[in-house]
Each structure stands twice: as structure tokens, then as C-alpha cells.
């Protein structure tokens, strides 16, 4: 047993998240996503699972230990609804609330077309499948850095000189 870790995070998921470096990406996907075949093309090469939970709950667990990248404009991506790229379904609104809570600030999702999402997911470090049954519960997160207290302040994507 470990302290201060979300109990959803298995040893395999924790190892993958800890092994990721700055700029690596993790995919959190719904039960409709072709997770196994896509995961085989990733850096990790195998599928990770958080069965029995929805996407928002999985995001809460993952972002409890994974910082988002502040060096890029869009560290969080959502799969667009086919034919309706500006539609934000409930599953994505719930995920947005979890991202904002984890980061303590607004980090709006950028959207990505479905097939472009599949291609991006194949280049990710790993894929985590959830039990989310609603469509469009698929997201990509880019890992950031944690700096020591005495490190120089890092510029955010919108605040570079």
C-alpha cells in the first residue's frame, strides 16, 4: 500500500506515467476506441486498463500524478464529434472539469478530428482504456515537468519572451 495515490492507479499505470518524459503523451479513451490495436503501436506497446470507471474519473486519477505541459499551447486534446467539431458532449464537459481541477486553472481542450486523433494516439507513449460507454470520451494529455522549488520560473506557452 502506498500513501497519497489514487487507488485506481495500478502498478502498470504508475510505471508508465513515471517512465514518460517531458512532452510524451498519454491517451485516455472510452470503450468504443480501438484501444488494443492502437496501443500496440505506441512506445509502451501494450494496452493499459482502468476498467469500470468513466473517462472523467480516469482523468482525475491520472492527473493526480501527471503534470500537464505548460510549454505548449494545447497540452490537452479531445476527439471531435464527427461532423460537429464545435459540439462538446457531456463526457467532454465532465473531463474538462477534472482537468481544470487538477491543474488549478482553466486548461481548455483543443479538438482533433477523429482519424487525426487515431494517428496521434499511435504516436503516444501509452494508451489507457476506461470503461466509459459514452462516445467521444477520448483524450490526449502531454506530460509537463515538476521543477524544484529553487528552479528558475518556467514560462508558460502564452507567456514566452
Language-model regions, residue ranges each:
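Long, charge-dense
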Residues: 50-73
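Solvent-exposed alpha-helices and their adjacent loops that cap or buttress functional pockets
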Residues: 9, 18-20, 39-40, 71, ...
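Long, hydrophobic N-terminal alpha-helical segment
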Residues: 1-51
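Conserved active-site and cofactor/substrate-binding residues in soluble primary-metabolism enzymes
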Residues: 4, 8-12, 21, 53-57, ...
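Alpha-helical scaffold segments in soluble metabolic enzymes
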Residues: 12-19, 57-65, 94-98, 127, ...
